[in-house]
Design a protein with these regions (language model features):
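Positively charged n-region of N-terminal signal peptides that target proteins for export
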Residues: 1-4
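Structured domain cores in non-transmembrane regions
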Residues: 55-134
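Post-signal peptide N-terminal segment of mature Sec-exported envelope proteins
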Residues: 25-46
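Residue-level recognition of well-ordered beta-strand positions that form the cores
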Residues: 46-48, 64-66, 139-145
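C-terminal motif of bacterial Sec signal peptides marking the signal peptidase cleavage site
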Residues: 13-16
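Glycine-rich, aromatic-bearing surface loops/beta-hairpins
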Residues: 98, 129-192
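Bacterial signal peptide processing site
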Residues: 18-21
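Short amphipathic, basic-aromatic surface patches that mediate peripheral association
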Residues: 48-54
Length: 192
């Protein structure tokens, strides 16, 4: 029992330190597989931010996909950062609840060119899986880079920032990260 408690405490601490809600961990673990089967038109990232926040010109989150075969002959490795496009909402929309007073949603989806690129990546994986000689598998990493968006006025640096994700319209959005723009910038600097 003591060991179970320590594991729970460790998981809780880890999630709290990174800003990832514990309830999201099971869905995040399924994300790579879901992305390979997802309709690219359904994929969206929603940010709930202070209503005064204005994204820097040209700054958009990127869908980062890294796909590496164990056997380099199986298929060509993929390392792509696909740009998303913006829509703004101050009311309930797309299954998201209305933001509290003083906040708004920035909703990012895949533009047509990015949808086509994601479909190409999905086809590459399906083709590799269908190939009888493909037995070795590979690694798939999926993330959403949003550090460029966090460049904000100092007055907003410590306001709440929530990141929500949808891979399939039927499943809706789920929260994947919460913190502040300052924390987001700090994470982006660590990744460089």
């Amino acid at each position: 029992m003591k060991r179970l408690f320590l594991v729970f405490l460790l998981c809780t601490t880890l999630a709290a330190c990174t800003g990832v809600p514990l309830r999201s961990l099971p869905r995040l673990m399924q994300l790579p597989g879901q992305l390979l089967d997802a309709n690219p038109a359904d994929f969206m990232v929603a940010l709930q931010v202070d209503a005064r926040f204005v994204p820097p010109p040209g700054a958009v989150p990127m869908l980062a996909i890294e796909l590496t075969p164990r056997d380099p002959a199986a298929f060509q490795a993929v390392n792509k950062k696909l740009p998303l496009q913006l829509a703004v909402a101050s009311a309930a929309t797309l299954g998201l609840e209305a933001p509290p007073l003083g906040r708004r949603w920035l909703i990012y989806s895949l533009p047509a060119a990015t949808q086509t690129e994601l479909q190409r990546i999905q086809a590459t994986v399906r083709q590799a899986k269908a190939n009888p000689s493909y037995k070795s598998g590979g690694n798939l990493g999926v993330g959403v880079e949003q550090g460029s968006l966090a460049e904000t006025a100092p007055a907003l640096a410590n306001t709440r920032w929530e990141t929500w994700l949808q891979t399939q319209k039927a499943d809706g959005f789920f929260e994947v990260w919460s913190g502040t723009p300052a924390q987001l910038q700090q994470l982006a600097r660590k990744d460089k």
